[in-house]
UniProtKB/Swiss-Prot annotation:
SUPFAM superfamilies membership: Cupredoxins
Main localization, broad class: plastid
A single cellular component GO annotation: chloroplast thylakoid lumen
Protein name stated in the entry: Plastocyanin
Length: 99
């Protein structure tokens, strides 16, 4: 599944920002605009026992250029909240449910 970082009209958002995937399906986050973005999973809003640091980008790492990607595969079923750390205050947050 591909998730865009930044909408086509320049909005600071994940597109889609609420979605489901089967366990083990790769999710590819792709920078869609010229803004620096990243993908960080909220350690308090992921299934118990999942290490947020193993599925998140480092807060200092950024996808700076359009077309740059970050891929993650989630296997533990449940709900995961994630955000872009530079733009979390602007509402750039999302949720994925692993079935």
């Amino acid at each position: 599944l591909d998730v865009l970082l930044g909408s086509d009209d320049g909005e600071l958002a994940f597109v889609p920002n609420n979605f489901s995937v089967p366990s083990g399906e790769k999710i590819t986050f792709k920078n869609n605009a010229g803004f620096p973005h990243n993908v960080v999973f909220d350690e308090d809003e992921i299934p118990s026992g999942v290490d947020a640091s193993k599925i998140s980008m480092d807060e200092a790492d950024l996808l700076n250029a359009p077309g740059e990607t970050y891929a993650v595969t989630l296997t533990e079923k449940g709900s995961y909240s994630f955000y872009c750390s530079p733009h979390q205050g602007a509402g750039m947050v999302g949720k994925v449910t692993v079935n």
